[in-house]
Structures are given as structure tokens and as C-alpha cells.
Amino acid sequence: YAYQVYAIALMISSFSLPTAVSKLVSIRLAKRQRRNAFRVFICSLAFAIGVGLFISLTIFLGAGLISTHLMKSPLSVYALRVLAPGLLIVAVMAVIRGYFQGMGTMLPTAISQIIEQVFNAVISIVGASVLFGIGTKAGEKSGKELLGPAYGAAGSTLGTVIGSLSGLLFLLFVI
């Protein structure tokens, strides 16, 4: 259930950013307005940070209400809270990828996507396994038998966030 909320929030925060930034940057560069192309990047980055931060905080702080009342799945609160910072990360990464595309190079984007998916796969599997075990033990102590799967789901969503963060760190290194 947490991924449904994440997907909607992701569309709101960063769905068309790479395309818009790419188009605006390439138009400026075609007119030899390098400084204006960079201004587009900076303004887009500020927008992405603002919107991404707002949506991330809204999801993180409202995870209890969203999971209980909207999704009717109270234990999905853990996965929602793990996914929330990823919205900011992906929004910033979308702008940087769009900037590179507008500059005429897709190599940094391609490499960052590979890095992102490798980290996502590994961390999702390891995180789900480790946190499932921790949640199961905590559930036995507290009498909540579904705590193990809830923690496991949160562990698997950790891969999404760490994967995005690794891709972003690569792009920041390249830029």
C-alpha cells in the first residue's frame, strides 16, 4: 500500500521535471545563453527542493493518518516513513538528469540509473530480510504478529531510497 501513496506523491513532485528542464536548457544553449541555461537549472533545483521537501514532510509526518484512515493499513506507516525522504531525493535527481539531457549528454543519467537499480535491488533484499527478523522478534514480544511483515516491507522500501540516494550522489559527483 505504501508504494501507491509513494507513486502518487512522486508524480506530483517530479513527474515532468526532467523533460521540462531538458527542453528549457537546450533552448537556452541553442541560443548560446549558457548562463541562462544554468539559471534554469538553479531555479528548477530550487523548485524541486521546495516541492520535494514539502511532499516528503507531508508524507512522513502524516504517515500515521494516511496509513490508518486512507489506506486502512496501520502497519504500512513504517514503509511510508522510510519512503518519504526518497521523494525529495528523486525530485532533485530529476532536475539534474534533465540538466544533463539538455546539455546533450545522457551518460551521467544512464550510469546513475544503473547505480540506483543495483543499490535498490541489494538493499531491498537485505533490508527486507534483516528488518523482517527484527520485526518478528519485536512482534513476538509485543503480541503483534504482523509486525515482522510490516518491518520487512519497510526494509524493502529502504532499497528504493538508498538506491535513489546513491544515484543522486553519483550525479552530484559528476556535476
Residue map of PLM features:
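Alpha-helical transmembrane segments of multi-pass membrane proteins
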Residues: 61, 72-96
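Transmembrane-helix boundary and interhelical linker motifs in polytopic inner-membrane proteins
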Residues: 12-46, 102-107
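Hydrophobic alpha-helical transmembrane segments
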Residues: 112-126, 130-174
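Small-residue-rich midsections of specific transmembrane alpha-helices
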Residues: 2-25, 55, 85-92
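Short membrane-interface helical motifs at transmembrane helix boundaries
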Residues: 54-74
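Interfacial/gating helices of multi-pass transporter permease domains
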Residues: 1-8, 74-75, 149-154
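Selective transmembrane-helix segments that form parts of the transport pathway or gating/packing helices
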Residues: 44-56
